[in-house]
Curated annotation (Swiss-Prot):
It comes from the Bacteria. Keywords: ATP-binding, Cell cycle, Cell division, DNA damage, DNA recombination, DNA repair, DNA replication, Ligase, Magnesium, Metal-binding, Nucleotide-binding. This is Probable DNA ligase. Pfam families: DNA_ligase_A_C, DNA_ligase_A_M, DNA_ligase_A_N. Signal peptide: none annotated. The active site is at 230 (n6-amp-lysine intermediate). It comes from Mycobacterium avium (strain 104).
Amino acid sequence: MSPSHAKLATVLLFDVATASADVGGTPSRLTKVARIADLLRRAAPDAALVAIVVSWLSGELRQRQIGVGWAALRSRPPAAAHPTLTVVAVDAAFAEIGAVAGKGAQARRAALLNALFAAATETEQTFLLRLLGGELRQGALAGIMADAVARAAGIPAAAVQRAAMLGGDLPAVAAAALSGEAAALSGEASALDAFTLRVGRPVAPMLAQTAAGVAEAIERHGGQAIFEAKLDGARVQIHRAGDQVTVYTRSLDDVTARLPEVVTATLALPVEALIADGEAIALRPDNSPQRFQVTASRFGRSVDVAAAVAAQPLSVFFFDILHCDGVDLLDAPTTDRLAALDALVPPAQRVDQLLTADPDAAGRFLEATLAAGHEGVMAKAPGAPYQAGRRGAGWLKVKPVHTLDLVVLAVEWGSGRRRGKLSNIHLGARDPATGEFVMVGKTFKGMTDAMLDWQTARFTELAVGGTDGYVVRVRPEQVVEVAVDGVQKSSRYPGGLALRFARVLRYRDDKGPAEADTIDAVRALY
């Protein structure tokens, strides 16, 4: 039976939820891959179903955002006794929730969400809660998922990885691989075109590793590095085909309509076909950067673009180029790509640069960049290619960090190799007016195995109301020092603020909760 006439599969939400639990419960990469591959075979050859399953097990919704925040997930109805929800039906429910708009939208979304949870079993509710809350960390992310797709389809993992890198969308690649289009990934030239670099289709962006300082960055790049100012704006990927410009976020969402300034700047360039990396940023009259949140506000779904442009226009700075008028530059060295960019983009729309082997010169460049209000520098290897979709060693970020002493309010049980350990900590800042603690974020980053053992014992002692649930509430007594990249506005937490990239440095047994940083100290970083 050909794929086009094969009977389409029915997969229940329960099947995905149990697979997720199984994957989260094993530290074995091979076992994770095998479990996911088995589920994907069941979903095949239904391309849409495969794409949904891959998205969910990667911790993402097909719809990206559906307007459901932390507050909406705090309570849920009693669970259903038996599983009846199909994956397709739940995906349709997500789409319906995301489409709600206008007066009474919040109440309507809440009603739809309640109906969905009421039809879900306890296992399914737990999965939905973690998926919608952004807490689905189970190791079933890009690398493992790509291997699982390859195993399920019987094709090389490298083919899947490259297709996902260039297509920018692993669910779409999985759908093609498991719906009879595997030739598109394994070598037939006519089909392979579907997953090559193409103007108008976003590419998974290259990401940076971290270096402790400029001297380390120079050493890791072989004795010389290209330093660039790291702007605290919003990364954008810009595509141009003739007079058509499309702008994507780093998560590959199309935001063209919200960023007319980027479109105008791109149309002014002497080029017909372009894929470029850039940074959109709100600047003050003196060209110093506005707070990150000012830039981020332009990316909201309900933004009044005309009013926003009039109130605070955005500027765009280009820092890399992937394609120019028929020439793919992904595999070209950094120096060649930057030369192509310099020939195309005016200096006023380029980030400041310094090519040097001298740590002192690099240090002065970093200091000047920070003095200008930017967040740090990027150090790039002169000979490195553009490693789309990877946190490549060719890019290193160097920036100062802020530290806060916060109080642990609750802890979540871990999964995978952290199964049986209290892992993800809820962080609170002290409210000097009430003496209470205001939640401002969560983190599981920076914890060593020894730290996990210690905090499991410590927070078991501090637990309030038992340790049987997924989230263990604790007495607010333990102070922890965390490093953060900054703070942003957020409706997710009661304090209205959220920490950016928080990671644990150490527990401060020398400090009591009364010595923890206040919510005012957190606001000062905003």
